């Protein structure tokens, strides 16, 4: 019976290597989340009309944008495998191909977003300003190219084991948005009051600044490997690897979006409780998301170097770390739900008593939900390190849309569990995805198989 050679470094050493990568990535994830929070806070101060218009436009924009982001996530594993193999030319080609792919995707998506700005407002619900939706979408979409380029540059630094530079740049973007968003929205000093368009412009300009700052750092990290030649093959390879990632992210995001729409049937209080619970989970999810990115880099680096046993260990360490973190978060949430919810809502207001009660019930289900969510995102990251993306897509489609939404709808409507039934469905879908993807990773890294 064929066995894998022993891993080259211990589990403890692998954990240290993973933490060195994951720490800066997690901070960068929180910084990206902070940009969205800043925009929401500024728009909220502009008024209810502006907030509703931005929410409506973002719902359409991000449904498309998240899939394009998924395509760009192919850069990091390509870089990691080339870096692990000592292929400096491969690293440089992955970066060059990634930037060209960002340009091509933007050339397709920007006209689409511009056209959408004329069509989408016609379907806006009552009370949502069509003019504000159109203006926001046109200005906000100007940040698409730098955002995609930033992902390619970030993937290069992460893939070569130097994600720390990304943290400083991301925090710079947060500071910029913190200063510029209110200045443009409210017209500080000599600046004109641009309202919602100003807040959107601040977000777009932050993306351009971050991409510009990260470019020399990523370029310095890539050793000169001579003329790279035509990059068409590399762009195609990145797209082949990335499109299943994009559809996987779209499938997961779509499951949550449809669940939110179904939750609206149970009234505004239950819908608000659902949103508060999801906000809580999303905040904690930034940590396993960073661990997943770092795990993908570690697996890709070791697989590229031909060390399959070490790649397997890297993936298992990442899965263990992610599970431990999410289990800790679940204990905190179950022990002190009111404290957790106080970040998002006034828990002492008697008017919110029903909301808090419903959200606490959802959070009790979310304990397992979070554990499985951390497992699936980390397993997905490990499989991306092996450049395995098509089977995870099929798993995600079945887990999220057949089991997650299908079972949730049955439990909610037929079994009479109401809103909790939808949460049980989400948890079942994530459980199937998590366990299946872990099994896929173990299969891909077993003895006798090439990474």
From Swiss-Prot:
List, in alphabetical order, the GO biological process terms annotated in this UniProt record: monoatomic ion transport
The regions listed as transmembrane in this protein's record are 23-43, 53-73, 101-121, 132-152, 169-189, 194-214, 243-263, 277-297, 316-336, 355-375, 391-411, 422-442
Indicate how the chain sits in the lipid bilayer.
Multi-pass membrane protein
Q: Which GO terms describe its cellular component?
A: membrane; plasma membrane
Q: Does the keyword Transport apply?
A: yes
Location in the cell reads: Cell membrane
Q: Which NCBIfam families match?
A: matE
Q: What is this protein called?
A: Probable multidrug resistance protein NorM
């Amino acid at each position: 019976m064929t066995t894998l050679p022993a891993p080259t470094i211990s589990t403890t050493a692998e954990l240290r290597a993973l933490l060195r990568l994951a720490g800066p990535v997690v901070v960068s994830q929180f910084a990206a989340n902070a940009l969205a929070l800043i925009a929401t806070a500024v728009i909220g101060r502009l008024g209810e009309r502006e907030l509703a218009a931005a929410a409506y436009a973002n719902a359409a924009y991000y449904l498309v944008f998240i899939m394009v982001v998924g395509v760009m996530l192919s850069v990091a594993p390509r870089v990691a495998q080339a870096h692990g193999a000592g292929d400096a030319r491969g690293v440089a080609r992955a970066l060059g191909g990634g930037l060209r792919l960002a340009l091509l995707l933007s050339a397709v998506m920007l006209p689409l977003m511009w056209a959408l700005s004329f069509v989408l407002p016609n379907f806006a619900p009552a009370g949502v300003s069509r003019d504000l939706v159109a203006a926001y979408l046109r200005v906000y979409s100007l940040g698409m190219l730098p955002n995609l380029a930033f992902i390619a540059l970030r993937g290069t630094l992460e893939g070569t084991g130097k994600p720390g530079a990304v943290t400083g740049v991301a925090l710079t973007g947060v500071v910029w948005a913190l200063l510029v968003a209110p200045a443009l929205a409210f017209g500080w000093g000599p600046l004109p009051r641009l309202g919602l368009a100003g807040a959107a412009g601040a977000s777009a300009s932050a993306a351009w600044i971050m991409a510009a700052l990260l470019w020399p750092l990523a370029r310095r990290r890539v050793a000169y490997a001579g003329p790279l030649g035509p990059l068409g093959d590399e762009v195609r390879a990145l797209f082949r690897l990335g499109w299943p990632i994009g559809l996987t992210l779209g499938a997961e995001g779509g499951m949550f979006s449809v669940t939110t729409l179904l939750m609206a049937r149970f009234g505004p209080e239950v819908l608000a409780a659902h949103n508060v619970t999801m906000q809580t989970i999303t905040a904690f999810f930034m940590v396993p998301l960073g661990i997943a990115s770092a795990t993908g880099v570690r697996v890709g680096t070791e697989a590229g170097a031909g060390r399959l046993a070490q790649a397997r260990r890297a993936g298992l360490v990442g899965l263990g770390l992610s599970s431990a973190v999410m289990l800790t978060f679940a204990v905190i949430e179950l022990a002190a739900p009111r404290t957790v919810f106080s970040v998002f809502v006034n828990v002492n207001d008697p008017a919110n008593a029903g909301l808090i009660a419903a959200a606490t019930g959802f959070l009790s289900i979310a304990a397992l939900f979070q554990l499985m969510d951390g497992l699936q995102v980390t397993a997905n990251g490990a499989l991306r390190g092996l450049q395995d993306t098509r089977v995870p897509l099929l798993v995600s489609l079945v887990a999220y849309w057949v089991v997650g939404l299908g079972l949730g709808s049955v439990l909610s409507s037929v079994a009479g569990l109401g809103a909790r039934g939808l949460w049980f469905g989400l948890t079942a879908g994530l459980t199937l995805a998590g366990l299946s993807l872990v099994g896929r990773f173990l299969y891909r890294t077993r003895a006798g198989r090439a990474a």
